[in-house]
């Protein structure tokens, strides 16, 4: 997935959920939009390098958007979680996700379930059961372990219940954890943050809901990030 042209700044603070102040190279302070409504644990430390895009819009109050954080250890994390579905759709189209490569038709944002949900992707293929794919973003990493969620997610819990119901109806049901961070080599739920989500997902896995986690890979040109892709599946390391 190609990233928009990016510029670097130093992170100062995040506030009102959707706003952040950054310091430019010339010392000026710029307020940028933050699309991530999560806790952003470990992704918003004062002094971190922020990579932002400029929409050049004359109508947006804050035309610049926070896209990536470059951490003190050099790892990159895409904090704009709106890009996760774009990333996964590209991977599905290019058959990068081997577990789902047999499907030829990809339908995004399809209504389904009994709790007024939308599935991120409904996959169809000749001779194959329909496959419901829910995408979750990995931005939280500790000790090289990718984790989800970074805050309590009642919405995520609902999605697991919906997927389990689809599995019981005979369809494939998949939770795909997409790496927006390039610093992990296995994945687990953050049970210390949301034990209910952890419990629900473990039970769903026992009943046939499939769970896959893919690492993220960033490309750079002259040290500027230019693209993000899903690299390879990583093992699950649940306790």
Curated annotation (Swiss-Prot):
The name this protein goes by in its record: Sugar fermentation stimulation protein homolog
HAMAP family in alphabetical order: SfsA (MF_00095)
Family assignment from sequence similarity: Belongs to the SfsA family.
Coiled coil: none
Organism: Mannheimia succiniciproducens (strain KCTC 0769BP / MBEL55E)
Domain of life according to the entry: Bacteria
GO MF terms held by the record: DNA binding
Source organism phylogeny: Bacteria, Pseudomonadati, Pseudomonadota, Gammaproteobacteria, Pasteurellales
Gene that encodes the chain: sfsA
